[in-house]
Amino acid sequence: MNRTTPRTTPRTTPGTTPPASSSSPASYVAPGAARRWKPSPFVTGSAALHVGAAATLVAQPALWPWAVGSLVTSHLALVAAGLWPRSTLLGLNWTALPESAGRQIALTIDDGPDPEVTPRVLDLLDRYDARATFFCIGDRALRHPHCVEAIVARGHAVENHSQRHRHNFSLLGPRALEREIAAAQQTLTDISGSRPLFFRAPAGLRNPFLEPVLCRLGLHLASWTRRGFDTRTRDATLVTQRLLRGLGPRDILLVHDGNPARDARNQPVVLDVLPRVLEAAAATQLRCTTLRAAIAPGAEDA
């Protein structure tokens, strides 16, 4: 199996261990295998600050304003890191494909499956001979298992986007996070016949408890390089411009087959956006692949 690291770390050769950094564990383990959690320097620093503040309160009670101020600042920094979807401060986060991907890009499609939109998206992908990664919601997969089966049958990958896509996901504690993610893992494995290797948080928002949970479940966090905001924007041209501005090799793109915005004709915007993006990618010799094919090729059949 080739071992690769995110864009934020130096390229390594197969069989080597990448160096530790804020976005890569000291001992890299490919997606699909449980790994030992190692807190990032940012999380370690925050924990040390908490210990220092507590020690200060015991030794010098008069310095309580400093201690409280330090704790508030630390908590605000942790919250800010969780509200930044592409941040690597809280742990490993794939924001781009590894260097070994060459001129490949990853098209990721979130919040489905949707019985109206997903089949039409699959038809478009077939037309352009493109492969995509579908981050599916467990509850929706249970309601529309035929869509999940079609995704896999047509050569695409199904990954974990939580069981219920809870809007308070980033506020959950470790046990609730694990229940939510593990439930989706079981649901999607049962329906697709393949165990998800990657997880994407609802809206990309998370907290420091997420990375240890993903380590136990053998999942890696994946966000994106650029997104179109196609659940809010009804103008397909504007969505396309956001996705294509600066598009290059190894980019991870985000669009939606679930809850897509609709244009003036009441058509899902994504159906107008995809042909433009796929044609532009082909014109610049960029080929769409799945996350697992680019990052964990040895685990494609996991």
Q: Which positions does each model-derived feature cover?
A:
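N-terminal membrane-anchoring alpha-helices
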Residues: 2-8, 12, 16-17, 22-94
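Active-site beta->alpha N-cap acidic-glycine motif
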Residues: 82-169, 180-183, 187
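C-terminal domain-boundary segment and adjacent tail
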Residues: 82-100, 128-129, 142, 264-302
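A cross-domain feature marking catalytic cores of carbohydrate-active enzymes
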Residues: 109-111, 136-138, 160-162, 200-203, ...
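Acidic-and-aromatic substrate-binding clefts and catalytic sites of carbohydrate-active enzymes
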Residues: 112-116, 136-144, 167-175, 200-208, ...
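A short acidic, helix-capping loop that chelates divalent metal ions and anchors anionic groups
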Residues: 165-172, 260-264
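His/Asp/Glu-enriched short active-site or ligand-binding loop at hydrolase and phosphoryl-transfer sites
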Residues: 205, 211-247, 286-297
